Swiss-Prot record:
SUPFAM superfamilies: HesB-like domain. It comes from Enterobacter sp. (strain 638). The gene is erpA. It comes from the Bacteria. Pfam families: Fe-S_biosyn (PF01521). Keywords: Iron, Iron-sulfur, Metal-binding. This is Iron-sulfur cluster insertion protein ErpA.
């Protein structure tokens, strides 16, 4: 997808840069970062990240800096208007989701409720 098109989910430059480094480390240019939502965590839903070399029917793909973020349709409905970012700080480094649909989140930020 083009950067000029309004996307339902943003893939930040910092996240794309880190994905690019991690894919290079794996020596598999077919890998994409997949973000998904599952039931669980202390707030009802939790975010998950994995590297995947497949794009399934219905998946949305966002490309930036030559790498791709992939989201399945079920997860996307909970992520519309959000952003996938990468942060480094005192708590360590990690991919994070900023989600305007979340009514509450847990302290670690990986679990939320709607």
């Amino acid at each position: 997808m083009s950067d000029d098109v309004a996307l339902p989910l943003q893939f930040t430059e910092a996240a794309a840069k880190k994905v690019k480094v991690l894919i290079a480390d794996e020596n598999n240019p077919e890998l994409k970062l997949r973000v998904y939502i599952t039931g669980g965590g202390c707030s009802g839903f939790q975010y998950g990240f994995t590297f995947d070399d497949q794009i399934n029917d219905g998946d949305m793909t966002i490309e930036k800096q030559g790498v791709a973020l992939v989201v399945d349709p079920m997860s996307l409905q909970y992520l519309v208007g959000g952003a996938v970012d990468y942060t480094e700080g005192l708590e360590g480094s990690r991919f994070v989701v900023t989600n305007p649909n979340a009514k509450s989140t847990c302290g670690c930020g990986s679990s939320f409720s709607i």
